[in-house]
From Swiss-Prot:
Gene assigned in the entry: atpC
Protein name stated in the entry: ATP synthase epsilon chain
Main location: membrane
Annotated source species: Staphylococcus haemolyticus (strain JCSC1435)
Topology in the lipid bilayer: Peripheral membrane protein
Role according to the record: Produces ATP from ADP in the presence of a proton gradient across the membrane.
GO CC, any one term: plasma membrane
Subcellular location(s) per record: Cell membrane
Length: 133
């Protein structure tokens, strides 16, 4: 089976690269999308979610927050604000972040509800991906 090269990049540089990927699945703003070798060139906006990476020896999950994906025939580039593999996620830190975000959402005087909603979505996403180890 043909494979693609996957590169996940954050503002800090490349954080994940794999050459033998059979299938990459991610959540775009239009819905879930899967990519295999030979896919037509595409650019899509990503929402906070996970990237599922299938390769011959297994599957890995990477939590990502906002960005976009560029798909070429044999290369997928994911450009996001943050990215963590399931094994890199500090579950306790993610739980604390979720609690803080929930607290801010409950505070009716909080003027930055949208920021708290985004923080909550990121924390919950990290916890979901951490469970996929």
């Amino acid at each position: 089976m043909s494979t693609v090269n996957l590169d996940i990049v954050t503002p800090n540089g490349s954080v994940y690269e794999k050459d033998d990927v059979e299938l990459v699945v991610f959540q775009t703003t239009a819905g879930e999308m899967g990519v295999m070798s030979g896919h037509i060139p595409t650019v899509a906006a990503l929402k906070t979610g996970h990237v599922k990476v299938n390769f011959r020896n297994g599957t890995e999950y990477i939590a990502v927050s906002g960005g976009f994906v560029e798909i070429r025939q044999h290369k997928v580039s994911v450009i996001v604000q943050t990215a963590e593999t399931a094994s890199e996620i500090d579950v306790e830190r993610a739980k604390l972040a979720r609690q803080r975000a929930q607290s801010h959402l409950e505070d009716q005087d909080n003027s930055d509800i949208n920021r708290a909603k985004r923080a909550l979505a990121r924390a919950e996403n990290r916890l979901r991906v951490a469970e996929l180890k």
